[in-house]
């Protein structure tokens, strides 16, 4: 707020402010701020990053325009390196996966087995990592699951693109899109003849140097293709998963988490910025209609807990029916799902890995 008061025209600052408020569930002036935001976007002003926009407005045309404004400012197509048409036919197709998340992270929780199960008679698999070298169990598994692991944390966009060219990648797959630690600039320099956006970010990148976005008919209905700069490569289901993941042995009791023994338990473990006032209104109405029910949600900030407690009371619901779950290690996090009866999804930014986790643990998911 202070930064906005000092320099309201600073690029993308309004969006950063709104995203922070969404993380804290501060909704007091949200409707007016969203009206201001969409007006500025329609005037081609640089006000918000595409990732932050996903949770705010369910309008694919505005989403695309947001991406185009952002990427033209931050990652315009580079002509430092000429575009690659194609390489002479290799014996094996060379695929490079690019990510900041080759570690314990939701993206790797979904994709770890993907790297392992490529047919090595037909494919050569490279990983280009620009995230922390954590050496945790997931990081080591992915290193072992690919043919070549390239640590490019200290390399520039151009040097990384040159490395990809030197190993003659046929296909470069961006697993992050506009999420945290994104390096879209690598793709702006044409790392490979074919460039694909997949799984980490399901909005359009808004530029012509991404050839395809992998999706399914639920994520992107055919009538919505016009809102994407990429061609849509449809799979029966876009989301890969890890079939080797075992169910946790940990057993929680309701008492461990502070849940009444006889209550029907709704839950949502999505990040707080995905919760909108409209979504919270729906949750309040559901609680009203199910006597003795409670809502278990993941919140990691005390200020967010205070704000959501205020919001539930404003909707006429006893604050004790809102129960906050803390961040837990993966086995305990999964085990906690066993305490719930129904997962309530957020809108417009739905659950991804969290929905898969719920289903894995036998918990039904109600989405929209």
Can you say where each PLM-predicted feature lies in the sequence?
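Alpha-helical solenoid repeat scaffolds of the TPR/TPR-like class and their adjacent stem/linker regions
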Residues: 1-259, 271, 281, 310-315, ...
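Residues that mark the start of a beta-strand
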Residues: 92-96, 263-265, 294
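Short hydrophobic "strand-cap" motifs at the C-terminus of beta-strands
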Residues: 98, 269-270, 298, 325
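A conserved nucleotide-sugar
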Residues: 122-124, 284-314, 319-320
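Active-site donor-binding acidic/aromatic loop of nucleotide-activated sugar
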Residues: 151-153, 320-329, 347
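A short alpha->beta transition loop at the rim of the catalytic pocket in nucleotide-sugar-dependent
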Residues: 341, 362-363
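Donor-sugar nucleotide-binding helix/loop cap in glycosyltransferases
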Residues: 344, 358
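A short structural motif in glycosyltransferase catalytic domains
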Residues: 346-348, 367
């Amino acid at each position: 707020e202070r930064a906005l008061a000092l320099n309201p025209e600073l690029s993308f600052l309004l969006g950063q402010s709104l995203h922070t408020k969404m993380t804290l569930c501060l909704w007091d002036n949200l409707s007016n701020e969203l009206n201001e935001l969409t007006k500025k976007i329609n005037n081609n002003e640089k006000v918000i990053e595409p990732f932050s926009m996903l949770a705010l407005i369910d309008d694919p045309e505005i989403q695309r325009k947001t991406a185009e404004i952002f990427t033209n400012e931050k990652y315009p197509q580079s002509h430092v390196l000429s575009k690659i048409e194609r390489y002479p036919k290799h014996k094996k197709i060379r695929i490079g996966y690019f990510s900041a998340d080759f570690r314990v992270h939701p993206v790797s929780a979904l994709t770890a087995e993907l790297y392992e199960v490529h047919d090595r008679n037909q494919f050569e698999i490279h990983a280009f990592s620009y995230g922390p070298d954590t050496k945790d169990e997931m990081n080591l598994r992915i290193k072992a699951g690919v043919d070549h692991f390239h640590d490019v944390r200290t390399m520039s966009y151009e040097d990384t693109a040159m490395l990809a060219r030197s190993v003659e990648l046929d296909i470069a797959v961006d697993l992050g899109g506009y999420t945290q630690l994104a390096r879209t600039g690598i793709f702006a320099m044409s790392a490979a003849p074919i460039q694909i956006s997949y799984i980490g970010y399901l909005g359009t990148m808004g530029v012509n140097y991404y050839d395809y976005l992998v999706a399914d008919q639920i994520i992107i209905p055919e009538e919505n293709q016009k809102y994407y700069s990429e061609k849509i490569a449809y799979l029966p289901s876009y989301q890969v998963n890890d079939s080797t993941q075992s169910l946790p042995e940990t057993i929680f009791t309701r008492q461990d988490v502070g849940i009444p023994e006889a209550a029907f338990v709704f839950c949502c473990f999505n990040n707080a910025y995905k919760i909108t006032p409209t979504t919270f209104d729906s949750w309040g109405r559901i609680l009203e209609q199910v006597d003795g029910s409670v809502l278990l949600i993941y919140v990691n900030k005390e200020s967010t807990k205070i704000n959501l407690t205020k919001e539930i009371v404003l909707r006429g619901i006893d604050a004790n029916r809102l129960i906050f779950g803390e961040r837990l290690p993966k086995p305990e996090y999964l085990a906690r799902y066993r305490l719930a009866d129904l997962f309530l999804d957020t809108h417009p930014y739905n659950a991804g890995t969290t929905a898969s986790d719920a289903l894995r643990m036998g918990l039904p998911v109600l989405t929209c």
